Amino acid sequence: MRESAAQYLRPGEPIQAVIGAQTASQWLAALTGFFVFLGLNRYRILAVTPTRIVVLDAGKTSMKTARGLVTELPRSTRLGPGTGMWHQVPAGSETLRVHRRFFKDLDAADSSVVAA
């Protein structure tokens, strides 16, 4: 994710954290089926830099490769602390759901805001 996100950053802009997220609730897959979930869900990559948070589209099937810019958030935006199995993060007009495996990255991103 880090390598594919780098092409959407400014030259020399370092990445502090990379976080995977999705737009649809995980309950949608359980209640309607996997194929409906794939039709409605989009994966996102949050690339956190010292000056901004870049939200990138990663497509419908994987969060591995960034495919385009969705929005930018101010660096002062708090992403965590993560709670539960899936933590919700408001990102522009979307609510992104971040799985607990990325909670350490949420904490790292938020701690670098405090340090700055």
Question: Residues of each region from the PLM?
Answer:
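Phosphoinositide-binding peripheral membrane targeting modules
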Residues: W27-G84, P90, T95
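Anionic N-terminal interaction surfaces
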Residues: M1-R44
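Aromatic-residue detector
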Residues: E13-P14, V18-G20, A58-T61, W86-V89, ...
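Canonical phosphoinositide-binding patch of PH/PH-like domains
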Residues: W86-S111
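Short intrinsically disordered terminal tails
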Residues: A115-A116
